[in-house]
Amino acid sequence: EIIMPTVNGCLNIMRSAAKQGVKNVVICSSTSSSNPVPQVQIKNEIDHWSDENEQCRAKKYTSATKTVMEKAAIKFAAENEQRLSIILPTGMYGPVCLPGHMNGNPHIWLQSLINGEEGRHKKVPNDSTSMSHLHDLAALFLAAYENPKSSGRYYGVYDSWHWQDIYAELQKILPNMKMPDPITEPPVAPTRFDFSRRDSLGVVMRDIPTLLRQTVEWIQSDPFKSIKYGQQV
């Protein structure tokens, strides 16, 4: 009920495109499709896949959906001679298109921090998260589409940072923000990626301090001031 509607939706679009002679396809997935068990020190897009059955057992159904969708799309593209590129993002920062997007992460908890309220966490998680700026992500999509030699999976993130480093950077931007309680144990190492394929697309991506600052400043500009936050458009 959760997985197949997304998979079938993707395949229906690819099937319709194939009927019209479309040979170049780019789809958006997630880094959650590249989490092998057991974990590896440095992940890459070629060798490392999540186990969708393991994801379902862990009730990570959205992540499992991405894994199944990618495998089905790759099979369909091969059978129909389509050049398929798959971009794998995680946390997407920067300007959004619609007011309703402000209700999702990370914008909703950044808005809370700007307002002096509690953000996403009461306590800093001993974990890391991967991030990219939406404009850079769009550039990766265009680069993959326009380069006739590109195909396969590409990470769509700048890098991964531990949450304590993310909050420390945000405090530089928002000195009076409400900080979550600190971790009391040694921090785990952030996820590490092999970005050689991503970099082959030739897109220069904003670093994490820059994308955090630009996102906060954009939210502070009240971009949807004529429309109340929360209204769906």
Which residue stretches match the model-derived regions?
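Conserved C-terminal active-site "lid" loop/helix of NAD(P)H-dependent oxidoreductases
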Residues: 168, 184-204
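Mid/C-terminal beta-alpha module of Rossmann-like enzyme folds, strongest
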Residues: 128, 138-187, 215-219, 223-233
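Conserved sequence/active-site signature of Rossmann-fold short-chain dehydrogenase/reductase
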Residues: 33-34, 92-94, 137
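Active-site YXXXK catalytic motif of short-chain dehydrogenase/reductase
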Residues: 62-70
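Glycine/proline-rich active-site loop of Rossmann-fold NAD(P)-dependent oxidoreductases
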Residues: 79-82, 94-110, 143-154
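Substrate-positioning beta->alpha
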Residues: 105, 122-143
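Conserved beta-loop-beta element that borders a ligand/cofactor-binding pocket
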Residues: 29, 69-96
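Conserved Rossmann-fold NAD(P)-dependent oxidoreductase catalytic core, especially the SDR/UDP-sugar
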Residues: 1-62, 85
